């Protein structure tokens, strides 16, 4: 729920860098970047021009060797807090009813065209007047599902942790958004699930 400029601001603290030893010079990052931020030197290794980079992290998601990393450890949690703040700005003082379809849960943000198969089976539809309770219920439902075989987290290479989101992205901190959402008064993580 942010404009293009707003999304750049949300991602701003998460600008990536390249671990040179891991870069194989495949140019995947350059092909997917709409801003021309990745460049290649004589050693054929990528570097990210942070002045051109908008922090969308598409290069991070597509890198086949995980050579591209977030620059700051706190970046994912800061991004999640900013998302909560943008959400509050949109819904504050307005009557809202929120609906989430927990289907085709992909390992990456659904804005990435290179996404993989779903990581868990389809769960269903959830609805609430409280967006925080809704998100918590959806997360709990996803975490209760078995991992899909042949998905990014179903293979033996993924983290074998209980948290499917951390299995897909070990450095993620999805809970920061919900904690911050409660703190700023967006809603409550407590919910009562009524199945219809």
Placement of each model-derived feature along the sequence:
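Extended, low-polarity segments enriched in aliphatic/aromatic residues
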Residues: 1-196
């Amino acid at each position: 729920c942010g404009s293009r400029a707003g999304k750049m601001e949300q991602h701003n603290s998460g600008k990536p860098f390249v671990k040179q030893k891991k870069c194989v010079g495949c140019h995947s990052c350059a092909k997917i970047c709409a801003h021309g931020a990745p460049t290649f030197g004589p050693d054929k290794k990528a570097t990210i021009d942070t002045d051109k980079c908008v922090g969308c992290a598409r290069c991070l998601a597509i890198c086949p060797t995980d050579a591209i990393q977030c620059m700051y450890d706190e970046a994912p949690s800061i991004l999640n807090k900013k998302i909560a703040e943008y959400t509050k700005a949109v819904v504050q003082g307005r009557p809202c009813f929120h609906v989430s379809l927990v289907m085709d849960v992909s390992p990456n943000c659904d804005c990435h065209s290179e996404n993989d198969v779903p990581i868990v089976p389809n769960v269903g539809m959830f609805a609430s007047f409280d967006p925080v309770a809704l998100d918590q219920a959806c997360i709990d439902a996803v975490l209760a599902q078995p991992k899909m075989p042949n998905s990014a987290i179903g293979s033996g290479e993924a983290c074998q942790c209980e948290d499917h989101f951390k299995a897909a992205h070990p450095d993620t901190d999805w809970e920061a958004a919900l904690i911050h959402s409660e703190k700023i008064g967006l809603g409550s993580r407590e919910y009562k699930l009524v199945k219809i």
